[in-house]
Amino acid sequence: MTKIAMANFKSAMPVFKSHAYLKELEKTLKPQHFDRVFVFPDFLGLLPNAFLHFTLGAQNAYPRDCGAFTGEITSKHLEELKIHTLLIGHSERRVLLKESPSFLKEKFDFFKGKNFKIVYCIGEDLTTREKGFRAVKEFLSEQLENIDLNYSNLIVAYEPIWAIGTKKSASLEDIYLTHGFLKQILNQKTPLLYGGSVNAQNAKEILGIDSVDGLLIGSASLELENFKTIISFL
């Protein structure tokens, strides 16, 4: 399976720097990168999607066409920008913004109905990890229960919460075991990405694991040269 690199800017990139980054990345890449490189700026960092060398996606959207949803963007906003790729289920939205499994299912089903490419994020906390691998498997299985695992436009990203933003990635053995388990659950055509303190120093080793189909990169993607280095490993 072709390897993938995704940059999640979260809320860390200044707006105009984000715009400049996207334009410079477009100049750097080639057409064959279009379905292999993805960038998720924050809402203000989004531009009309005329990019031909990478895929532009949104970090979040409310599951409605439009309406009285103060502070949200909806499918019509994204479609107007020609954006059809969306992150759903990131741990920061689950934990900080209290997005429940039922709401994530609603969001998934709505954007599946719009034929969006959905990057669905899962991952366990440290307490669960410390209980052992059986507990991790049960936790991750529950996170996948409410979505259609045979949806053809699905990508799953495994991000252990305890590794996000800590500068301490999961060990290669942990990634190998966890991805091996998840591959047994997922449709064989569904790409499975790893995220959690991925950087230019560890990306090549992680991508070397057969069951890792790509990377979801946070802070290490904020500097274009770092992201370009990671892309070179694909």
From Swiss-Prot:
Transmembrane segments: none
Gene Ontology MF: a single term: triose-phosphate isomerase activity
Binding site for substrate: 8-10, 165, 197
Enzyme superclass (EC): isomerase
InterPro entries in alphabetical order: Aldolase_TIM, TIM_sf, TrioseP_Isoase_bac/euk, Triosephosphate_isomerase, Triosephosphate_isomerase_AS
A Pfam family the protein falls into: TIM
Record keyword Cytoplasm present: yes
Chemical reaction(s) catalysed: D-glyceraldehyde 3-phosphate = dihydroxyacetone phosphate
Annotated keywords: Cytoplasm, Gluconeogenesis, Glycolysis, Isomerase
Chief localisation class: cytoplasm
CDD domains assigned: TIM
Residues forming the catalytic site: 90, 159
The keyword rRNA-binding is assigned to this record: no
PANTHER family linked: TRIOSEPHOSPHATE ISOMERASE (PTHR21139:SF42)
Role this protein plays: Involved in the gluconeogenesis. Catalyzes stereospecifically the conversion of dihydroxyacetone phosphate (DHAP) to D-glyceraldehyde-3-phosphate (G3P).
Quaternary structure (record): Homodimer.
Cited NCBIfam families: PRK00042.3-2 (NF000728), PRK00042.3-3 (NF000729)
Name recorded for this polypeptide: Triosephosphate isomerase
Annotated organism of origin: Helicobacter pylori (strain J99 / ATCC 700824) (Campylobacter pylori J99)
Gene: tpiA
